[in-house]
Amino acid sequence: MRVLCFAVFLLSLMSFANSAYSTQNTIATIDKVLVVKSERKLHLMHRDTVVKSYRVSLGKKSGPKQYEGDQRTPEGIYAINWRKHSDNFNLSMHISYPNAKDVQRSQESGLPPGGMIMLHGTPNDEEYPEWFFNTLDWTEGCIALTNPDMKEVWEAVQDGTLIEIRP
């Protein structure tokens, strides 16, 4: 009986070690984040293959970001360039908006492009449950995930990773 219990223990331990190893390998292989606004999806990518997908919430207004304060989520190619722990939204990762095209459009329109577009979790709000925020577009132009999903993305995506935001 002891031998059987020990064998079960060893198998469990090996299974845990394997899952931890494969998670670390998956995390190390994310080379792109793809957001498809029309699908409300964020995809973690490795060599053009989707590794994992998440539902997201976007800016309150549809269409590409035009100027500061328009409550739209930008569209284009950017990078995740820094991260922080946020008092309001738990974990957050900065998206390098505006890019050169955004700056050019801004100069042509005479309106500031804005900035501080983040990939972040849901608010620390006692009045509304977390699932509520994942059912609608509520941000000022950022991309929001549930806090557990944001934690996974935080662990999987390195600073400097490309993020493409499509319509």
PLM feature spans:
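Residue-level detector of beta-strand structural context in well-folded domains
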Residues: D31-V33, R40, G69, L91, ...
